[in-house]
Structure formats: structure tokens, C-alpha cells
Amino acid sequence: MSIFLQADSLSVAQNALAETVPVEKTISIWELLTSGGIAGQMIMIALFIMLFFAIYLYLERLMAIGAASKIDNNFMLQIKDHISNGRIDSAKMLCASTNSPVSRLIQKGISRIGNKLEDTNTAIENAGKLEVYKLEKNVSMLATISGAGPMTGFLGTVVGMVMAFHKMASGGGQIEVGALAEGIYTAMTTTVVGLIVGLIAYIGYNHLVVKTDKVVHQMELNAVEFLDLLNERK
């Protein structure tokens, strides 16, 4: 008889313990992203718009810069051969048929053959500045997003914190700690998303800068090589 009583007591104790153990509340990523109220949701929308533009700008510039860096290794050899043998028109046609910043620089220089070397150099430099401007088009927007993303996320966190403490004040200070903590970690979500957006834009920006510098270096080398060729013809 006592054995049954002990078993019943143990069962009651286990049930009571199960009732006192708090059930862990789970939340999906989507619920976390959209749980910041109207203000938080608007800031999240702004952050995702920034993320979309950052990815789009990066991919668009990456393809454009990649296309600009492609040039036939024999291009300058053919230019040297044409100019050395007086085939200026053939050199111009070769440049016109090659779509690259280097070919446009050389084409500008060929059009100045017969003028002073300083004038030719100036024309090539001006054409080079235009090509660099084309390469760097919209790249600065990535730098802007890399800074604006984290700041926008931080703004969302501040707004969320203000709303959480306003809710506590409106309740006369009688608010559960769990509810306050939920409001705080929801507000912190915008900072996390903002940092992710800023990091993606920052890495993309620096990668494009490195690739642009390589193309500019290639342009400078070919421009110097062309000017040396003109100097030898004198």
C-alpha cells in the first residue's frame, strides 16, 4: 500500500515540477523582422531596399569593370606594327573595333599624331579621366550604403527602445520583465540587419575599388607605351 502512495506522490511532484518549468518561446526570423511595429517595419523596408541596391550596383559594376579589363594581349603589338609602318588608318580601325578603355585612349592618341607630344599626352590624360569616371560610376553609392545601413539600423533600435520604455511608462511602471526584454531584442534586430547591409556594401565597394585600380594601372601602362612609341618615331 505504501508503495502505491509513494508512486502517487512522485507522480504529483513530477507534474508540479513540469508545470513550474517555463516553456521556451520560439520565434521565426520573419516574425523577428516584422515585430518592430510600424516604425520598425518601415526601417526594415528601407534596409532591404538598401541591400537590394547594394547587390545590384555591385553586380552591375563588377560586370562592367570585368568587361573593361579584357583586352587582347596582341593589341599593343599590332598598334606598334601599324604605326611603325605608317598605317595610321589601320591603327585607328583596330582601336575602333576593340571596345575597351585602353583602345579608346590609344585611339585618342592616334588622332593627335602630328601634334606636339605634350598635346598628345594631354589628350590621352583627358580621355583617361573620362574612362576612369565611367568605371567609377555609382561605385560611391556603395560607400554611402555601407555607412547609411548601420546608421539606419541603429536608428531603428533607438526608436524601438523609446517605444519599449514608453510602453513601460504608460503602464505605470507595472510591466513584466519578459515583455520589456522582448521589446528590446526586437528593437536590436534592426541594428543587426543594418550591420549586415553595411558589411555587404563595404566589402563590395572595396572589391570594386581594387578591380578599378587594376584597370587604371593597365591604362597607364599602355598610355606610356604608346607615348614612348611616338617619341621613337621622331
What does each model-found stretch correspond to?
Residues 37, 55, 91, 106, ...:
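Residue-level signature of catalytic and energy-coupling elements of molecular machines
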Residues 5-75:
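Hydrophobic membrane-targeting segments
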Residues 30-43, 125-146, 177-189:
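Alpha-helical membrane-interface segments at transmembrane helix boundaries
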Residues 68-175, 203-234:
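Predominantly long cytosolic amphipathic alpha-helical stalk/bundle segments
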Residues 2-20, 157-172:
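Juxtamembrane non-transmembrane "cap" segments at the membrane-aqueous interface
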Residues 184-204:
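Hydrophobic alpha-helical transmembrane segments of polytopic membrane proteins
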Residues 42-59, 145, 152-155, 193-200:
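Lipid-exposed faces of alpha-helical membrane segments in multi-pass integral membrane proteins
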